[in-house]
Curated annotation (Swiss-Prot):
Keywords: ATP-binding, Brassinosteroid signaling pathway, Cell membrane, Glycoprotein, Kinase, Leucine-rich repeat, Membrane, Nucleotide-binding, Receptor, Repeat, Serine/threonine-protein kinase, Signal, Transferase, Transmembrane, Transmembrane helix. It comes from the Eukaryota. It is an enzyme of class 2 (transferase). This is LRR receptor kinase SERK2. May be involved in the regulation of plant growth through the brassinosteroid (BR) signaling pathway. It comes from Oryza sativa subsp. japonica. Residues 22-219 are extracellular. The gene is SERK4. It catalyses: L-seryl-[protein] + ATP = O-phospho-L-seryl-[protein] + ADP + H(+); L-threonyl-[protein] + ATP = O-phospho-L-threonyl-[protein] + ADP + H(+). Residues 284-563 form the Protein kinase domain. One of its GO terms (biological process) is brassinosteroid mediated signaling pathway. Residues 241-607 are cytoplasmic.
Length: 607
């Protein structure tokens, strides 16, 4: 009987915990439904699972209370669920970088434990709810780059714990509550706000500030003026990429002198302290190395809020203008925003280091999925390979034709195309690509790229252009079809060509293209689509850059427009070129024999 009472007591104590988890799970599942989550995203957010603490992107405490939900940059396009307000133990909520619309529910004011709320870069509208002023523990509030209107609620000024508030680039109006100017870091740029008497210059200038540990009022004024001058210089020197959702001047934060290297925002970029990235990557541990390219190693890292990042630690990077030139280049690259381009989210500079920070792509690279995957891991099927082809083409088209100045990648290959959680391709490693003027090519004393992917004119002259990237893209298409490397010396064992391009050309002439298709596809592909992709690849890899199509033409051909005409023209040229080559070869052989015969005659003559 005593044992029964103990068991009943244990069950009674446990029930509230399970009940709380169940309620939190219901709230999170409703959040998923309202966000219009599609595909395999959040597939483990199952309404039938009592405990949400096992769900992806959810962190709980020891009592099974949900304390963190991090769903940044997932492409969600729904609305915010009012039931989020039921998560009373939640401390961190991040939904930045999605396409969430609608307003912030009033119920968010019930998140009594919340310390960090990040809804930046969405499509949110309406007024900022006054109920957010009830969040007495809130330290970080980021609502920048949305479409909020109305005034800033006075209630926000009553949050004494607030250390960072960013409301930039909305449609806010009215007066900024005075106490918000006492927050250690704020940004109100890109609105129609009235500063009143609380700020040393007009609201029409850049409304951002980050304090140092002992900065004086003079430091504030000098930092502000310096920020304005720096912004004007950047605006005068460079034109930003076309098609940005917002065309106004970007915010620039000035790092006011302090004892610690602290994070600052450079537009939408974050400037990380060296120590932050050192901690995130476990002191740049070798076990966190994701890969190594021409510019340095890439490390996997985890930020304190659980966000996974990829940190590129640059080696042998030389910028004639020092840090200032590096920052200008980083700023230009950061505005190249496209669905199929890897977004730069931050950077770090010290006297001896240059680092770039990107979101972590959990499905790694196309090259990994083609050749380096582990047993049991899925390989890229044919529909996914087609998506890689068209997505990569669109990303490169954007760099070439929609950025001013245009951006030349210079190392297009399967290893530099990454895959997000939906296997959508994003072109990476263009972070330090040479920026060129519209009517100029790029000339460099050091050829950047990977053998087998480098266009012949770039290798021989050091001149790169958009058509240099087109060549590399063509080789990448051959990688997609064959699963093979651009250079593979093992092909010599079968007396085949070392270069993948030459190998494919030979099989194309012999009518044996079927033998080159990746065996991992298990014949689950469309023959006509494979042939089309190889045809486009061969058009892209013509020896003369003038003969190669532009990336916009490549996109159209992949969509079924204009390939037949280009291919027929290519075949005619190729036949003529082949005949000329064979004719020259015969002449060369004859001349060679004649020389040898003449030498024999001379040697056999009298001495």
């Amino acid at each position: 009987m005593r044992e029964l009472r103990v068991a009943v007591l244990i069950i009674a104590v446990s029930l509230p915990s399970f009940s709380a988890s169940d309620r939190q799970g219901d709230a999170l599942y409703d959040m998923k439904q309202k966000l219009n989550v599609t595909g395999n995203q959040l597939s483990d957010w199952n309404q039938n699972q009592v405990n949400p603490c096992t769900w992806n992107s959810v962190i709980c405490d020891n009592n099974n209370n949900v304390i963190q939900v991090t769903l940044a940059a997932r492409g969600f396009a729904g609305v915010l669920s009012p039931r989020i307000g039921e998560l009373k133990y939640l401390t961190v909520l991040s939904l930045a970088g999605n396409r969430i619309s609608g307003g912030i529910p009033e119920q968010f004011g019930n998140l009594s434990s919340l310390t960090s709320l990040d809804l930046e870069d969405n499509l949110l509208v309406g007024e900022i709810p006054a109920s957010l002023g009830q969040l007495s523990k809130l330290q970080l509030l980021i609502l920048s780059d949305n479409n909020f209107n109305g005034s800033i609620p006075d209630s926000l000024a009553k949050i004494s714990s607030l250390t960072d508030i960013r409301l930039a680039y909305n449609n806010l109006s009215g007066q900024i509550p005075g106490p918000l100017f006492q927050v250690a870091r704020y940004n109100f740029s890109g609105n129609h706000l009235n500063c009143g008497t609380n700020f040393p210059h007009s609201c029409s200038t850049n409304m951002s500030y980050q304090s140092g540990s002992h900065s004086s009022k003079i430091g504030i004024v000098l930092g502000t003026v310096g920020g304005v001058i720096g912004l004007l210089i950047v605006a005068a020197l460079f034109l930003f990429c076309k098609g940005r959702r917002k065309s106004h001047l970007r915010e620039v934060f000035v790092d006011v002198a302090g004892e610690d290297d602290r994070r600052i925002a450079f537009g939408q970029l974050k400037r990380f302290a060296w120590r932050e990235l050192q901690i995130a990557t476990d002191n740049f541990s070798e076990r966190n190395v994701l890969g190594q390219g021409g510019f340095g190693k890439v490390y996997k890292g985890v930020l304190p809020d659980g966000t996974k990042i990829a940190v590129k630690r640059l080696t042998d990077y030389e910028s004639p203008g020092g840090e200032a030139a590096f920052l200008r280049e980083v700023e230009l690259i950061s505005v190249a925003v496209h669905r199929n381009l890897l977004k730069l989210i931050g950077f770090c500079t010290t006297q001896t280091e240059r680092l770039l920070v990107y979101p972590f792509m959990q499905n790694l690279s196309v090259a990994y999925r083609l050749r380096d995957f582990k047993p049991g891991e899925p390989v890229l099927n044919w529909p996914e390979r087609k998506r890689v082809a068209i997505g990569t083409a669109r990303g490169l088209e954007y760099l070439h034709e929609h950025c001013n100045p245009k951006i030349i990648h210079r190392d297009v290959k399967a290893a530099n195309v990454l895959l997000d959680e939906d296997f959508e391709p994003v072109v990476g490693d263009f972070g330090l690509a040479k920026l060129v003027d519209v009517q100029k090519t790029s000339v460099t004393t050091q050829v950047r790229g990977t053998m087998g992917h480098i266009a012949p004119e770039y290798l021989s002259t050091g001149k790169s252009s958009e058509r240099t990237d087109v060549f590399g893209y063509g080789i990448m298409l051959l990688e997609l079809v064959t699963g093979q490397r651009a250079i593979d010396f093992s092909r010599l064992e079968e007396e085949d060509d070392v270069l993948l391009l030459d190998h494919v050309k030979k099989l194309q002439r012999e009518g044996q293209l079927g033998s080159i298709v990746d065996r991992n596809l298990n014949q689950n592909y469309d023959d006509e689509e494979v042939e089309m992709m190889i045809q486009i690849a061969l058009l892209c890899t013509q020896s003369s850059p003038e003969d190669r199509p532009s990336m916009s033409e490549v996109v159209r051909m992949l969509e079924g427009e204009g390939l037949a005409e280009r291919w027929e023209e290519w075949q005619q040229v190729e036949v003529t070129r082949r005949q000329e080559y064979e004719r020259m070869q015969r002449r060369f052989d004859w001349g060679e024999d004649s020389v040898y015969n003449q030498e024999a005659i001379e040697l056999s003559g009298g001495r």
